[in-house]
């Protein structure tokens, strides 16, 4: 089944060229089923690239999904055309009185700052609190995962001596978790970050379960026991060339970055990067949509807030 997006969204043509099933709004109105309502809070500076990456994964599920793109008002984007934001994005005030089946909150390149110093921190707090009461399941990615763990559970982030960048192998700690249905015993995923959360803090928090970790990259997947929150410190959504673009950007800035690990053949940045996480990325997002959203969310969106209250009290 497809995702439903505007026909003139730049991602539409790109995804159709990759044989990803998308449906324009005009075609979708003829179908008499309730699609899932998913909101993507896009905090990345390269918003068009990020929305395309996530839509590629969401569009490969057997479910029809309505997508709402959300931006922050407190931060002015310098890397995305204003007309794109005005045409395709909403603000929190425009959606706060409704409910959603699922939410995805992306990472952001602000991890060098204390959380409270991020210019949209208070707005993000409102969004996260809203998600806790009006969204059935929320997926937090990279910095957003650290931000949510800090906000809801007081779990701190720690600076790393050097940036983690590359493709790393991960051990599945709870193979019966439905997010891992169809997974191999281990899986690879990209990481790109300067900070981490530590396993000990996760294990000390009774509302949370540590699902997967990497010997090199550390904590990777965490969930709240009622499935209402999923925290991913890596970037399964990344394209083949995303780490390459980040590496070359940092080289151009004179930062002397390390070559991303386990990424280029023979660690040669002139070679085409390997992409060995695509299958698990598609499977993870399909499992999240199906098992944590579609199979559990109420048919009526208006019942989500009541359902979330019941789950929180269970």
From Swiss-Prot:
Enzyme class, spelled out: transferase
GO terms of biological process kind: L-methionine biosynthetic process from homoserine via O-succinyl-L-homoserine and cystathionine
The keyword Cytoplasm is assigned to this record: yes
Residues forming the catalytic site: 142, 235, 237
Catalytic activity reported: L-homoserine + acetyl-CoA = O-acetyl-L-homoserine + CoA
SUPFAM superfamilies, per the entry: Class I glutamine amidotransferase-like
Name this polypeptide is given: Homoserine O-acetyltransferase
Species annotation: Desulfovibrio desulfuricans (strain ATCC 27774 / DSM 6949 / MB)
